Amino acid sequence: MLKSNSIHSKRITTASLIVALGIIYGDIGTSPLYVLRAIIGEKNIDEVLVLGGVSCIFWTLVFQTTIKYVWLTLKADNEGEGGILSLYALVRKYGKKLVIPAILGATTLLADGIITPPITITSAVEGLDKVFPHLPTIPIVIIILSGLFIFQRFGTQKVGKIFGPVMAVWFTMLLILGFSQIIKYPGVIKGLNPYYAYLLLTKYPGGFWLLGSVFLATTGAEALYSDLGHCGRKNIRVSWAFVKICLLTNYIGQAAWLMHQGQQTLQGKNPFFEIIPEWFLLPGIIIATFASIIASQALISGSYTLISEAINLNFWPRVTVRQPTELKGQIYIPSVNMLLWMGCVSAVLYFKSSVNMEAAYGFFITITMMMTTILLSFFLIYRLKWNKLLVFGIVFIFGLIEFSFFIANLIKIEKNWAFLLFGIIIFMVM
């Protein structure tokens, strides 16, 4: 029988919900910075592409994020803790070979952490080009990343208190910016109709391969489960309702701008920054940059937790683990910190722009999600005693969705070979 944890039964308060915003939604919450731009790319802008893209984003968030992670996967708490290795700890006695999806999932999740901070921070900083044309962004991004990793040894107990309020401001900004465009062109809401997703995937030339870009909207879903121990199931589920509304409103707002901006192609523009009023552009970029830093911090902390769990399961060599503050659960692993810093800076120098990073981002996390689905099926059958036919149906649906994303992301291997090598090295260490 699963042990209950007080973190799941504690009273939901405004303060606890704001804390949840600052801890777990950084990755998925900063996706509007680059997702629609990645979908449109250099293609001609038309109704099927724009509305189909929004429709795919909406239904991906419904199925992959809301149903699979927020509803189903959060049920699998290991004494209040979440994450793929905690899930493995719950089911490992039901099959010796389950160690394979556990290690593979953990490996790809850690490898994904090499490119998430660079793409998030670079996407935000590149907005400065609208205010200060020709300003070199690469040095700024490297300085921010380096400062972030240097700061890790001191812990985030004090500054962590502002993460929640900053992310609350960020999501409110997403909501207002999106709504300001929707009220101008309300007809774009019809993009939520799954018919447009069907049109994009089956009728639009090369539409299926656009799933590789659509997937970027849900890459942060795994973090919702990984950070279960920090926030609790109830806080995640309630706060997700607010976050989802803000995200969708912004995506639809960007689509409204795309449908009425008057140009055949994006011409290098980012829809996210185009819907920000000129008078608010600099404050908006500053808020976006802070949100991207918080998103990166959450991922770095998650990497420490992942390695700590791997050490406890004898999946990773024993390395120095420090506790920089008295805050429960906060750890710092110098060797992992150095590894992530080198990987992130290398990614910035190699790709040079967020557009190039988009072409490589998402491949690893599709594998993590498929491995989570495999482990989750054993949890539902053997721990929750769900009907096997029901579980097989669930696995089939999510397996089909995730395998489609995986196939669409395979074309990214060409630009992802260095990170593929990094992932292989991590897998060999484990």
Language-model-detected regions and their locations in the chain:
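The structured alpha-helical core of multi-pass membrane proteins
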Residues: 1-430
